[in-house]
Design a protein with these regions (language model features):
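Rossmann-fold NAD(P)-binding glycine/threonine-rich loop
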Residues: 102-131
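Conserved N-terminal Rossmann-fold NAD(P)-binding element of oxidoreductases
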Residues: 1-6
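Conserved Rossmann-fold cofactor-binding substructure of NAD(P)-dependent oxidoreductases
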Residues: 56-73, 80, 84
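C-terminal catalytic/substrate-binding lobe primarily of soluble NAD(P)-dependent oxidoreductases
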Residues: 152-407
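Short beta-strand element of Class I
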Residues: 24-26
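N-terminal Rossmann-fold NAD(P) dinucleotide-binding loop
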Residues: 8-12
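Rossmann-fold cofactor-recognition segment
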Residues: 45-60
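Helix N-cap at the beta1-alpha1 junction of Rossmann-like dinucleotide-binding domains, i.e.
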Residues: 30-34
Length: 407
């Protein structure tokens, strides 16, 4: 596993809990001390899996290759940054390792993400006889598997799909992001995008919003965003007439975001800053990226768990033609308690909902249930064994048939 942030911490805990499946495990990251701390916390919690750690720069293909050649993993779980997907995939191909990630590739110098860069690896993974599993977090990931499950068991044709993501938690901070601030702010300041009648429709950032009611939470203002799983789902389920992704934001969060943008702190280009030298002898010109500097001063998402209250609610609202030939609606979702996630893994619910599915995807691969040569999005595999594990591993799902979808 590459990465040692909140999601990686959760995934590591869950791997240690399933030592009957995962017998050999290594965590590697830019800072080995972070990997060692995860292992220490896992062993303190009473899990006995032998976990190796290593230092690696995931931007460097040669370093990755040296690590993979030494350890010889069957599967590499990429929980590093989206900028690093392609270097890790290259190293996997060079060393005969299969691959799994939770977020699609995004170039560092452009706030833009899509699957085409990774789909371009299909033939190379196929020829090498290796599996690449893309987008195996919650959204993307579980939301795509929910859709596959609905298509397999409840619908002849899915016509309308709305993925809804609510974080109704309170971390008692004026402003903080629930995962890497740089990635988070880049994502939500982009233009919105949804699929309707065979084409992509673009909106201004956060332009479209409406109140949606979430189970056990109530109504929350939900905003239409561009989210990557829509891109693969409309290809794999061509009967879909419209597919959208919605996420909740509080007014305080949006006000901070507006100020960050207005003062130029969301910029991803380099600016030159004259930094005074420590000995007072003058200044040095240094290049900094404002958004990366902002990340350094914002709360670390890994430190939010302790005082986090409330829960997340993420699911799919689907309308289409059921197996009986009549129109039906279907809502499948999970609610996850921040407090319960923290008590189990030391991390908050947003990290938990991404880290658990990453482990389950790895389990599906290791058991031979999700193993075929090529590059695949998760909805292209059998959803049933994954759905079964969600209930066992801490993310139970619930269904509402023929309810009001509000959309």
């Amino acid at each position: 596993m590459i990465g040692a942030g909140g999601v990686a911490t959760v995934a590591a805990f869950k791997i240690a809990q399933n030592a009957d499946v995962f017998t050999e495990f290594m965590i590697a990251s830019r800072r080995k001390a972070k990997c060692d701390k995860i292992v220490e916390d896992i062993h303190k919690a009473g899990y006995t899996l032998d976990i190796k750690t290593a230092q690696v720069d995931a931007d460097d293909v040669e370093q990755l290759k040296a690590l993979f050649i030494g350890y010889k993993p069957e599967l590499v779980i990429n929980l590093a940054l989206p900028y690093q997907d392609l270097t890790i995939m290259e190293a996997c191909l060079a060393c005969g390792c299969s691959y799994l990630d939770t977020a699609n590739y995004e170039p560092k110098d452009e706030a833009h993400f899509e699957y085409s860069w990774q789909w371009a690896y299909r033939e190379r993974f196929k020829e090498a006889g290796l599996t690449a599993i893309l987008g195996c977090g919650f959204d993307p990931g579980v939301t795509s598997i929910y859709t596959a499950y609905a298509a397999k068991h409840h619908f002849k044709e899915i016509h309308y799909l709305d993925i809804v993501d609510c974080n109704a938690g309170d971390h008692h901070k004026a402003f903080a992001t629930n995962f890497n601030p740089e990635i988070n702010i880049r994502e939500i300041t982009q233009k919105g995008l949804y699929w309707e009648n065979g084409q992509w429709v673009e909106t201004e950032p956060l332009e479209i919003h409406k109140d949606l009611t979430y189970p056990n939470i109530g109504p929350r203002d939900s905003y239409l965003l561009h989210h990557e799983e829509i891109e693969s789902l409309v290809i794999n389920y061509p009967t879909i007439k419209r597919a959208r992704f919605w996420m909740t934001f509080g007014q305080q969060y949006l006000k901070h975001l507006e100020v960050i943008q207005n003062i130029g702190m969301s910029r991803i280009d380099e600016v030159v800053y004259e930094a005074p030298l420590a000995d007072g002898s003058g200044v040095a010109k240094v290049k900094i990226v404002p958004l990366q500097f902002l990340k350094a001063v914002l709360p670390n998402p890994q430190d939010l768990g302790e005082n986090y209250e409330g829960e997340t609610s993420i699911g799919c609202r689907i309308r289409g033609i059921g197996n009986d030939g009549k129109e039906h609606t279907y809502y499948v979702y999970n609610n996850c308690s921040h407090r319960a996630a923290y008590e189990e893994t030391g991390m908050q619910g947003v990290s938990y909902t991404t880290g658990v599915p990453a482990m389950i995807g790895a389990m599906m691969f290791c058991k031979g249930l999700w193993k075929k040569a090529g590059v695949y999005n998760v909805e292209e595999f059998d959803p049933d064994p994954f759905m079964e594990q969600l209930n066992k591993q801490g993310l139970p799902w619930h269904e509402i048939h023929d309810g009001d979808l509000e959309l």
